């Protein structure tokens, strides 16, 4: 029986991703003035409306409405026919200050007063695979590339009739060793102007987007292409569907190839281990795989609120390790510090670097420079093997 695996991605103009980008744009603006600000901003989007709420503790002053409308405009919602535009949207701001109880627990770790405690309990996962140069599953890497390509086709007016909302999905067939054998199917749905015919859109998307992204040695005559399979897709974005921060956590991470602890990223400052520890776990997994420790590796790290040191750390190499599990744990324990303040300092996370991550994935990015994607520990790991 054939074995398949699928991942998806969405465009920057997807309603949930609009919300994520606004939340991280607010975070970045605050961090520019106040690197130690605490943020847990949430955003909803709907027809003609953006609601911003959550918690923010900072000495900075930022223009929330302007940040939201500038972000919407940058994404491409700037024409009245889209039903959701930067110039007409209503922005409501209901942000409040962070709970004092949470603040004191974070500022004074129970197990180490000189360290920050975790901002909440919970578990995070980090993952890497040598399946691609980006150390992401091929299905997710290709899905993200499809979404970036369709954005470029719209912004560069190669396909000027495209609108900002889009989704993509790639399915591969695997061999008996779980290696990619071929691309079995591609699904791509994109919003478009009313005038374009479905026939033209499908031909253009195949030529200018899909065929320019997919590795031709992995497609064959049996590869299936579903381009706008629902047909008409004129109404899209928040005019058609409401959006909310944190609803694309699998798109943001590993495309379903690894576990997820449930915590979202956007709008959260680095004291929130949902974000910072997940980034650090990716950093560890990527460096370990790049050093040849295993073909793929997943870390689970768990925390207690107000406590600096992790409650637990578990490693799974899926049977691909080149050394013993004991050796892997020994290397990780020796080289990597999972306490929140150590993570913040090691990755320099008190900077306005987050908005750029809020679309097209937080990991495996080759178009932007992210500290948790650095391979600066590979040499040290190899020296310990």
Curated annotation (Swiss-Prot):
BP GO annotations: one-carbon metabolic process; S-adenosylmethionine biosynthetic process
Enzyme Commission number(s): 2.5.1.6
Region annotation Flexible loop: where it falls in the sequence: 98-108
Record's keyword terms, sorted: ATP-binding, Cytoplasm, Magnesium, Metal-binding, Nucleotide-binding, One-carbon metabolism, Potassium, Transferase
Pathway note: Amino-acid biosynthesis; S-adenosyl-L-methionine biosynthesis; S-adenosyl-L-methionine from L-methionine: step 1/1
Gene3D superfamilies: 3.30.300.10
Enzyme class: transferase
Keyword Cytoplasm: yes
Record's subcellular location: Cytoplasm
Catalytic activity line of the entry: L-methionine + ATP + H2O = S-adenosyl-L-methionine + phosphate + diphosphate
Record: residues binding Mg(2+): 16
Binding site for K(+): 42
Any one cellular-component term (Gene Ontology): cytoplasm
Binding site for ATP: 14, 165-167, 232-233, 241, 247-248, 264, 268
Cofactor note: Binds 2 divalent ions per subunit. Binds 1 potassium ion per subunit.
Gene Ontology MF terms: ATP binding; magnesium ion binding; methionine adenosyltransferase activity
Keyword Lipoprotein carried by entry: no
Known role: Catalyzes the formation of S-adenosylmethionine (AdoMet) from methionine and ATP. The overall synthetic reaction is composed of two sequential steps, AdoMet formation and the subsequent tripolyphosphate hydrolysis which occurs prior to release of AdoMet from the enzyme.
Quaternary structure (record): Homotetramer; dimer of dimers.
Matching NCBIfam families: metK
Similarity annotation: Belongs to the AdoMet synthase family.
Protein name, entry field: S-adenosylmethionine synthase
The organism of origin for this protein: Leuconostoc mesenteroides subsp. mesenteroides (strain ATCC 8293 / DSM 20343 / BCRC 11652 / CCM 1803 / JCM 6124 / NCDO 523 / NBRC 100496 / NCIMB 8023 / NCTC 12954 / NRRL B-1118 / 37Y)
Gene: metK
């Amino acid at each position: 029986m054939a074995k398949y695996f699928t991942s998806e991605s969405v465009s920057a103009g997807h309603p949930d991703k609009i919300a994520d980008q606004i939340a991280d744009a607010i975070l970045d603006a605050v961090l520019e003035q106040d690197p130690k600000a605490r943020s847990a901003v949430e955003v909803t989007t709907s027809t003609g409306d953006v609601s911003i709420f959550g918690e923010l503790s900072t000495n900075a002053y930022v223009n929330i409405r302007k940040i939201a409308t500038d972000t919407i405009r940058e994404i491409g919602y700037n024409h009245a026919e889209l039903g959701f535009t930067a110039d007409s949207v209503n922005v409501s701001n209901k942000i409040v200050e962070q709970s004092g109880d949470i603040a004191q627990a974070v500022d004074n770790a129970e197990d180490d007063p000189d360290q920050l405690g975790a901002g909440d309990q919970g578990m995070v996962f980090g993952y890497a695979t040598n399946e691609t140069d980006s150390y992401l599953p091929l299905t997710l890497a290709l899905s993200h590339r499809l979404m970036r390509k369709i954005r470029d086709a719209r912004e560069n007016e190669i396909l000027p009739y495209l609108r900002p909302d889009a989704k993509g999905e790639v399915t591969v067939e695997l061999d008996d060793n779980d290696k990619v054998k071929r691309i079995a199917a591609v699904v791509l749905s994109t919003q478009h102007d009313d005038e374009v015919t479905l026939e033209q859109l499908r031909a253009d998307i195949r030529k200018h987007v899909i065929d320019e992204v997919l590795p031709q040695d992995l497609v064959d005559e049996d590869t299936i292409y579903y381009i706008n399979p629902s047909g008409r897709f004129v109404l899209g974005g928040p005019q058609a569907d409401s959006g909310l921060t944190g609803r694309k956590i699998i798109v943001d991470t590993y495309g379903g190839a690894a576990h997820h602890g449930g915590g979202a990223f956007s709008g959260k400052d680095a004291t929130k281990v949902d974000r910072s520890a997940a980034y650090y776990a990716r950093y560890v997994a990527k460096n370990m795989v790049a050093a040849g420790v295993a073909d793929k590796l997943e870390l689970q790290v768990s925390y207690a609120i107000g406590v600096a040191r992790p409650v637990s750390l578990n490693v799974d190499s899926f049977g691909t390790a080149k050394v013993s599990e004991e050796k892997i744990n020994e290397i990780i324990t020796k080289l990597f510090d999972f306490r929140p303040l150590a993570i913040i300092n090691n990755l320099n996370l008190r900077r306005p670097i987050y908005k750029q991550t809020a679309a097209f994935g937080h990991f495996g990015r080759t178009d932007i420079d992210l500290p948790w994607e650095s391979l600066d520990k590979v040499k040290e790991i190899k020296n310990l093997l």
